[in-house]
């Protein structure tokens, strides 16, 4: 999968930016605050339907303007090319078109462009709480399996309804009669989410282990293990998981009523990232954590390729300066077949790491100052 070109209008600090890309490496360099990351963000937006930096589309509009637009042309291996357009007018709903055909739901965007983002903030996957690890998995799964994204949306809506119900039961006990309906709806989508997460984590863990063996010379063993918020076995199918979850919802009912929210379910899941069977978060050094995230990200690329028969595009946002020379070389050797977009402050930083098929773009104040 290749992004052939990008057009930005009134996006962040870009007024009218048009770029033709190399099929391999595209390096955007310049001082901080010039608009390099905005280019990667726009590509990511076309893959996922949302920014990785803000949940407010209004923040993407160039100051003093009323709207923004993004357009990319995507070429798929053995498939039809796709033109993706995203536009937003202030105080209106975001508009998305694929090959000039408007789509009403973001879920329909999934699968038209696969993108893996790697930034220094990805250390949060290790360092911070379950939300960051769930987000990491959910973003990738949503791209390769649009039905998963739909189930996440449904679960969010159902949880909101169920939680409202729980908060009002004490003042209106008759509402208890409707709880079972919401439990069944929740259990149905939750079971599908849980099964997908379990399968994904098994695949990712195996691929990350292989990558980590190369990176560390087999001196460390990494694992990425799914931890469901209630007990399931590896053999449980979707129907069995649904039944188990219904039992858990019944058991936690009184506690949920007291607290006013649903205390068990996929929204409370976590993943254990281990090095040599020890928690990476608790016991891993900074270097071990960086190596683990690097292995996970390369595994993510391989997993997307295995699931879709397409390499995703890779967005490296100010990552190279965070890696030592050995990790830099390992990363670049691992992505030779992947179209890659890189931001940095100094293009000389790469030395001989890049192939001849590389384009350099200097970004100054949202403008492409030079292209070599």
Swiss-Prot record:
Keyword Protease recorded: no
Record flagged with keyword RNA-binding: no
Signal peptide range in chain numbering: none
Binding site for ATP: 30-37
An example Gene Ontology molecular-function term: single-stranded DNA binding
Alphabetized UniProt keyword annotations: ATP-binding, Cytoplasm, DNA damage, DNA repair, DNA replication, DNA-binding, Nucleotide-binding, SOS response
Location within or outside the cell: Cytoplasm
InterPro entries assigned to the protein according to its UniProt record, in alphabetical order: DNA-binding_RecF (IPR001238), DNA-binding_RecF_CS (IPR018078), P-loop_NTPase (IPR027417), RecF/RecN/SMC_N (IPR003395), RecF_2 (IPR042174)
Cellular component, GO, one term: cytoplasm
Any one Pfam family match given in the protein's UniProt record, by short name: SMC_N
Gene3D superfamilies: P-loop containing nucleotide triphosphate hydrolases, RecF/RecN/SMC, N-terminal domain
Main location: cytoplasm
GO terms under biological process: DNA replication; DNA synthesis involved in DNA repair; double-strand break repair; SOS response
Superkingdom: Bacteria
Family membership: Belongs to the RecF family.
Stored HAMAP family: RecF
Protein purpose: The RecF protein is involved in DNA metabolism; it is required for DNA replication and normal SOS inducibility. RecF binds preferentially to single-stranded, linear DNA. It also seems to bind ATP.
Name of the protein in question: DNA replication and repair protein RecF
Species this chain originates from: Ruminiclostridium cellulolyticum (strain ATCC 35319 / DSM 5812 / JCM 6584 / H10) (Clostridium cellulolyticum)
High-level lineage: Bacteria, Bacillati, Bacillota, Clostridia, Eubacteriales
